[in-house]
A protein has these predicted regions:
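Short glycine/proline- and charge-enriched loop/turn segments
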Residues: 21-28, 91, 126-132, 171-178
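Alpha-helical transmembrane segments of multi-pass inner-membrane proteins
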Residues: 1-26, 32-99, 106-114, 118, ...
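A membrane-periplasm/extracellular boundary helix in multi-pass inner-membrane enzymes
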Residues: 5-10, 80, 97-138, 146-154, ...
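Membrane-interface junctions at the ends of membrane-embedded or membrane-associated helices
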Residues: 55-62, 219-225, 270-284
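A conserved mid-to-late transmembrane alpha helix and its immediate loop/hinge
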Residues: 36, 74, 79, 146-149, ...
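Membrane-interface catalytic loops of GT-C/OST-like multi-pass glycosylation enzymes that act
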Residues: 34-37, 81-84, 183-188, 249-260
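Long extracytoplasmic/lumenal interhelical loops at the membrane interface
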Residues: 17, 131-146, 154, 158-197, ...
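Transmembrane alpha-helices of multi-pass inner-membrane enzymes
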Residues: 103, 107-110, 208, 237-284
């Protein structure tokens, strides 16, 4: 709600958060209580799919409240102007619908494409900057990736040690990026994990993610309770969304986002446990 309020009254434009040349008419990006619009968007990507499942699982009174919350959340993520957040939420919805009934996927894709001409001009222009190397934030990320490449050449096997503070100190032993500063993290969950823990740590992390997703999908297919299936599909969708965002953002930099990440991981684990219990009862 506070994010929607900020979108209504407007917030100060922060030049470091948006390219003022390519997005000249774009208003300030809302951040709610999270100080950073991308972090706010990450929270919404992880939680909005659960809200959608709550809407489907509730009776009429619960549907009213969850629908209101869902609409407010969708509006708020629009006001963040977070491109990675939009991509993550779109993927989360597609995964959610694909698990429930894959026939929904072509329909939602057609609706999404048909809606593009009706988007506000500022959002449409923001979408067009995705992948544009002239955009300052895109250029900033590629500069960080280049510095990370230099670091990986020295530490790819054993890593530099746990924590973004350690990574920041090691970055300061390499040349600065184009604006004269040093990166504080890699702007990528997987590069960050690799840089901190080495190649074995990265492989273990990827194995954990794949195992959890595989367990979730198997439990979804085995579950008989439609409410559990919806909740599990939502959790898997939100998890896929935040994993994709992790390609462009270090989503664990802020503890609150890391907490929600592991909360979502735990929701999948809890649903898997419930699905197994239900299966055991049916076979007993």
């Amino acid at each position: 709600l506070y994010g929607c309020y900020q979108g209504y009254v407007g917030v100060e434009v922060v030049p470091s958060q948006q390219d003022m040349t390519l997005n000249a008419d774009m208003p300030g990006r809302v951040y709610s209580f999270f100080d950073n619009p991308n972090n706010f968007a990450e929270q919404l990507v992880m939680l909005l799919p659960l809200d959608l499942a709550l809407f489907l699982n509730s009776h009429w009174r619960g549907k009213v409240f969850s629908l209101f919350s869902l609409c407010a959340g969708v509006a708020a993520i629009g006001f963040t102007y977070s491109r990675s957040g939009w991509i993550g939420l779109a993927l989360a919805v597609v995964v959610f619908l694909a698990l429930l009934d894959w026939r929904f996927v072509p329909l939602i894709l057609l609706v999404g494409l048909a809606a593009i001409p009706f988007l506000p001009e500022t959002i449409y222009n923001r979408i067009l900057t995705i992948g544009n190397t002239r955009d300052t934030s895109t250029r900033y990320r590629f500069e960080i990736y280049q510095t990370t490449k230099n670091l990986m050449e020295d530490y790819w096997a054993r890593g530099v040690g746990l924590g973004s503070d350690v990574m920041k100190k090691v970055f300061q032993t390499y040349p600065t990026i184009f604006d004269g500063s040093y990166p504080i993290h890699t702007h990528n969950n997987y590069l960050q994990m690799w840089g901190e823990t080495g190649i074995l740590g990265l492989l273990a992390f990827l194995a954990l993610l794949l195992w959890q997703l595989k367990s979730g999908v198997k439990a979804f297919c085995a579950a008989a309770d439609v409410r559990l299936r919806r909740l599990l599909a939502a959790a898997i969708g939100g998890f896929c969304g935040i994993l994709v965002i992790g390609l462009a953002e270090y989503t664990w930099f802020y503890p609150r986002n890391m907490f929600t990440w592991w909360f979502l991981f735990g929701v999948i684990a809890a649903c898997v446990k419930l699905a197994h219990l239900q299966k055991d009862k049916r076979t007993a």
